[in-house]
């Protein structure tokens, strides 16, 4: 059977595979469109296996919020190059996979059982793993899901920084109005910028607090214009015992564990 340009174009639109791959698939299957799709799928699996040993060091983070606004999910999917990480086909795929993760009952983690479970989640008539294999073949680079996380509360927000280099999700219990969302969004931005280890001072052990104070004072003493050490210690004690939250803030929300994914 003669393979026409329109057939190749149709198969390419159906699968996203390259023109030459589509032409080869149609030739191998004597123009049978369904068989050609299956051929490309199997060929994609073979290509993905060949790329399995490559290093996927680039990538992007994407986040999503559930329809009721109470659950947030953030995911990191890696590619081999920054060029692909910025590709709209790739980023749209990441967003779709994150939506599947959000809709599932999985909680997330890094390189753990939930990653394997996510790969088995139904996705566009197949599974996430099948889609990952197909995208690897279509895009031409190794793609891998590195991690995803969820948080839930009475209200949840997300923040993506640097075009997807950093993704943050934060949930809280309490009010769920616009003021609460604005406060949480500001917190998410601070988490993205500062990467805090603790939510509040009460979460820090006395030993760790003393160590942090010592490091801060010693660093300040390197400045010739610095105040004497006893005065610095008193100033830091005062700062540590103060509250960055007003009574109104504290009554508004109780922050759950924030999650920050940063591509390294």
Predicted regions and their residues:
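ATP-hydrolysis module of ASCE/P-loop NTPase motor domains
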Residues: 264
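N-terminal assembly/interaction segments in proteins that build large macromolecular machines
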Residues: 2-252, 256, 260
């Amino acid at each position: 059977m003669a393979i026409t340009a329109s057939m190749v174009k149709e198969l390419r639109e159906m699968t996203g595979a390259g023109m030459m791959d589509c032409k080869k698939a149609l030739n191998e299957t004597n123009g049978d469109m369904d068989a050609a799709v299956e051929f490309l799928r199997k060929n994609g699996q073979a290509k993905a296996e060949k790329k399995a040993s490559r290093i996927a060091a680039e990538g992007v983070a994407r986040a999503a919020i559930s329809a009721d606004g109470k659950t947030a999910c953030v995911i990191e999917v890696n590619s081999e190059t920054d060029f692909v990480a910025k590709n709209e086909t790739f980023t749209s795929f990441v967003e779709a996979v994150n939506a599947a993760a959000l809709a599932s009952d999985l909680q997330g983690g890094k390189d753990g059982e939930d990653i394997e479970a996510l790969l088995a989640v139904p996705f566009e008539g197949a599974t996430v793993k099948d889609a990952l294999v197909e995208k690897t073949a279509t895009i031409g680079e190794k793609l891998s899901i590195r991690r995803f996380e969820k948080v839930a509360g009475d209200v949840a927000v997300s923040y993506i920084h640097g075009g997807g280099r950093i993704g943050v999700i934060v949930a809280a219990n309490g009010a769920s109005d616009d003021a609460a969302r604005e406060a949480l969004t500001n917190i998410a931005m601070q988490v993205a910028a500062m990467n805090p280890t603790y939510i509040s001072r009460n979460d820090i052990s006395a030993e760790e607090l003393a160590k942090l104070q010592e490091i801060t004072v010693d660093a300040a003493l390197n400045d010739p214009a610095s105040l004497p050490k006893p005065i610095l210690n008193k100033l830091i004690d005062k700062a540590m015992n103060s509250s960055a939250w007003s009574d109104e803030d504290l009554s508004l929300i109780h922050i759950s564990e924030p999650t920050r994914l940063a591509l390294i």
